[in-house]
Amino acid sequence: MTIKLELLEAALRNALGDQLQSLTQALGEVTIVVKSHDYASAMRVLRDHADLRFEEMIDLCGVDYSTYGDGLWEGPRFAVVSHLLSIKHNWRVRVRVFAADDEMPVVASMIDIWATANWYEREAFDFFGILFEGHNDLRRILTDYGFIGHPFRKDFPVSGYVEMRYDPEQKRVIYQPVTIDPRENVPRVIREEQYGAK
């Protein structure tokens, strides 16, 4: 571990204290996990604490862990992962928070702390169905307003439920049930002995 990462780890442990559920360092990156009820206060500490000063939220996304590790995952299904940047210290940190309820995943909104969280949270809501408590404009951002479901959930069918097409008789776009016939894909086997030889 480099001295820079050691300093970051010590500063995170000191500033967050009991709010820090876990801290891991892999591939030159630090990832922390906080509990959902500590999420808002921990993120405010990350931004405001003099030893940290994570002024920028670079990214925020949702994660569905339902099939993680070949389905051996035992923890909560949904998580929100944020990437923060401290310009002052030239540090980056990944913050993970798990939603307590798998049926209706809810975590606190970060728009009061970082304005950039607005569209990131809308995207996580649109694709994963994660609700952000305190977000004042939580609506779909990339899928159609009439879209049913959340397409990045692992249980969402790859083909979707409906498809759109232009109907020349009605002179408008219409929805109809998916007309793709299910098929079974046979994996292609490549023998390594003579692969690519001429």
UniProtKB/Swiss-Prot annotation:
It is an enzyme of class 7 (translocase). It is found in: Cell inner membrane. Keywords: Cell inner membrane, Cell membrane, Membrane, NAD, Quinone, Translocase, Transport, Ubiquinone. It comes from the Bacteria. One of its GO terms (molecular function) is NADH dehydrogenase (ubiquinone) activity. Its main location: membrane. Transmembrane segments: none annotated. PANTHER family: NADH DEHYDROGENASE [UBIQUINONE] IRON-SULFUR PROTEIN 3, MITOCHONDRIAL (PTHR10884:SF14), NADH DEHYDROGENASE UBIQUINONE IRON-SULFUR PROTEIN 3 (PTHR10884). NDH-1 shuttles electrons from NADH, via FMN and iron-sulfur (Fe-S) centers, to quinones in the respiratory chain. The immediate electron acceptor for the enzyme in this species is believed to be ubiquinone. Couples the redox reaction to proton translocation (for every two electrons transferred, four hydrogen ions are translocated across the cytoplasmic membrane), and thus conserves the redox energy in a proton gradient. NDH-1 is composed of 14 different subunits. Subunits NuoB, C, D, E, F, and G constitute the peripheral sector of the complex. This is NADH-quinone oxidoreductase subunit C. It comes from Janthinobacterium sp. (strain Marseille) (Minibacterium massiliensis). The lineage of its organism: Bacteria, Pseudomonadati, Pseudomonadota, Betaproteobacteria, Burkholderiales.
